[in-house]
Regions:
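Polytopic alpha-helical membrane-helix bundles and their juxtamembrane interface segments
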Residues: 1-193
Length: 193
């Protein structure tokens, strides 16, 4: 009975969820979520992220986890466009080129997940563009931190996609977790004044 709850697999699952849980609690406690759409949308994105993290712990739930993260990215986009916003020309061009590159590399190797992967890459690119649009309009420290967080999240997802659908590589898991948690922390921190 004790082994069931203290096995390395269950410990890994617990520790994988804790950082995002702490961010949810921190933003709910510290952020101005009652009056600011931005903070409420980031909080919603974090909640969908922790659900996605949980689902991705089970290989059979990859599509559900992908959908949960996709929903989280949409909430982040809502947050980024809820403030002043401007079209960020150069970041948009760069992100679109990178997204098209990822689609061209992963589309043929993603099997039955071709359409979900295509939609997911499109949405995460949109999340990055909206984060830089907020930065373009506001040019504040929280906007810089939010754009940096979105960039790290995009990097994390690109490495995850490459590792899963194209070619697994040795350090992928560590790099994915480092960029993912750093990105989420920065996005959460962007709610602070």
């Amino acid at each position: 009975m004790v082994t069931k709850y203290t096995s390395p697999v269950n410990a890994y699952r617990l520790f994988k969820l804790l950082p995002i849980l702490f961010l949810i609690i921190w933003v709910a406690d510290s952020g101005d979520y009652q009056t600011k759409v931005y903070t409420r949308a980031i909080l919603a994105g974090l909640c969908f992220s922790i659900v996605g993290d949980f689902l991705l712990l089970f290989p059979t739930q990859f599509k559900s986890g992908l959908f949960s993260f996709l929903t989280g990215h949409i909430w982040y986009m809502v947050a980024f466009i809820s403030c002043d916003w401007s079209v960020p020309i150069l970041p948009t061009i760069i992100i679109i080129i990178l997204a098209m590159g990822m689609i061209s590399q992963l589309y043929s190797t993603s099997g039955k997940l071709k359409i979900p992967v295509l939609v997911y890459i499109t949405v995460i690119a949109g999340m990055g563009i909206t984060a830089f649009g907020r930065l373009e309009a506001i040019q504040s420290t929280p906007a810089i931190i939010g754009a940096m967080g979105a960039t790290l999240f995009m990097i994390s997802d690109c490495i995850l996609g490459w590792n899963k659908f194209k070619k697994p590589f040795h350090l992928a898991e560590g790099i994915i977790l480092l960029t993912y948690y750093s990105g989420q922390w920065m996005i959460a921190f962007s709610t602070m004044k």
